[in-house]
Every structure is written in structure tokens, then in C-alpha cells.
Regions:
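Substrate-recognition/cap helix-loop segment adjacent to the acidic, metal-dependent catalytic center
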Residues: 93-140
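Metal-dependent phosphoesterase signature
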Residues: 48-94
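Acidic, Mg2+-coordinating phosphoryl-transfer loop and its flanking beta/alpha structural elements
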Residues: 163-200
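Conserved Lys-Pro-Asp/Glu-containing loop-to-beta segment of HAD-superfamily phosphomonoesterases
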Residues: 145-173
Length: 204
């Protein structure tokens, strides 16, 4: 199979966290039921990632849905913990991206990410990842999110390759399925060892 480019998700692939770990710890500390919290988180996160609402507005919606009365101070603590949770770099992924680049593969980045986080954290803390990319799409800059078909088509157009020559790496099944629906190849990320081994089998 001819693969010419590998596109990477951010959270859970370029980072070591798959959910905001500091938020989980803070919810426990504040006595907020995690199951109730996560329902609201999942309901409103994509609107935040698309740039339609701010992080503060997202948390206000979470509290409102759950009927929680939460102080501004506690909300600010959750917002800080949320941002910090996504800043744990996966250095193994960085080294793999470098190795793929050296082998002649184009590199893409396709992520659901709010504009503010991209400006204040991603572009500085992950600058060496970004430097490897031949094309990048950040959902909040475009007003669309994975798994919408249009966001995959946008990265494909920017990297200027046919869909069948692209391989997408993401830890979320619905996003992997979305890329396949757009005609891409895809591998769901679980661990670095797994995804690297699966990729080598994939390109045989």
C-alpha cells in the first residue's frame, strides 16, 4: 500500500494525556461527581474546540447542566487545570515523527483544539512538533471539528495528496472512523509501540 503522508492528532498522541488529568483530580478534590461532570464535558467540548465558545463558557454550561453552584475561583482553577493537562509532551511520538520525515513521508497535524489554547500553549510548547509538519489544521481556526468530513478534506487539500495516500493517527475511534469515511487510511493510537508496529505492517 502506498502511503505518502502521516497525519497526527494532538491530545493522546502528541501528549501523554487522553483526558485532562488535572481536571479529574480537581473534581475529586472539590467533591464534584465525575460521571456527572464528564457528561457535560463531552456535551460541550467540541463547541469549545471549534472556537464557538470560550473555555469559561464551556465550564459554565457544564455547571448549569449538572445543577452545580460553583464559584468563579473554582471555575478559574478548572480552566487552569484543563490547559495544563494537555501540556504533557509525548517525546516518543516526536521522535517517530522525525524518523518518518527522514524516510520521506510528509507529516500532517489534524487536531480538535481551541484557538486560545493553540495561541497560548500549543504553538510554543509543541513548536518542534509543528516544525515537522508539511500541513496543519487546527479545528478552532476553521470552525469545524473531527469527525466532520470537511476537516479531513481540508488537511488533504493542504498536504496536496490523494486521500488514499494518507494515514491518520488518532486515539479516538470516532475520529479514526471519520478519516476512513473521507477515504483515508487510519490507525487508532493506543501506545507508541503498538502504533509504530501497526504502521510498519500497514505499509508492507
Amino acid at each position: 500500500m502506498k502511503i505518502s503522508a502521516v497525519a497526527f492528532d494532538f491530545g493522546g498522541v502528541m501528549t501523554t494525556s487522553t483526558m485532562p488529568q488535572r481536571v479529574i483530580a480537581l473534581a475529586k478534590e472539590k467533591g464534584i461527581d465525575w460521571n456527572v461532570f464528564v457528561n457535560g464535558f463531552n456535551a460541550h467540548r467540541l463547541d469549545y474546540d471549534a472556537g464557538h465558545i470560550t473555555l469559561g463558557e464551556m465550564y459554565a454550561l457544564i455547571w448549569g447542566d449538572a445543577g452545580f453552584s460553583v464559584s468563579d475561583e473554582t471555575t478559574a482553577a478548572f480552566m487552569k487545570a484543563d490547559d495544563e493537562s494537555w501540556c504533557y509532551r509525548n517525546e516518543r511520538t516526536l521522535e517517530w515523527m522525525k524518523a518518518l520525515k527522514e524516510r520521506g513521508f510528509k507529516i500532517g497535524i489534524l487536531t480538535n483544539m481551541a484557538p486560545k489554547f493553540a495561541r497560548e500553549h500549543f504553538r510554543s510548547r509543541f513548536a518542534d512538533f509543528i516544525a515537522l509538519a508539511d500541513a496543519m489544521v487546527i479545528s478552532g481556526d476553521e470552525g469545524m471539528v473531527k469527525p466532520q468530513r470537511e476537516i479531513y478534506d481540508l488537511l488533504r487539500s493542504r498536504i496536496n495528496l490523494p486521500a488514499e495516500e494518507l494515514c491518520f493517527i488518532d486515539d479516538v475511534e470516532k475520529n479514526v472512523n471519520g478519516s476512513r469515511a473521507a477515504g483515508w487510511n487510519a490507525i487508532r493510537f493506543a501506545t507508541n509501540d503498538q502504533v509504530e508496529a501497526d504502521f510498519e505492517k500497514f505499509i508492507l
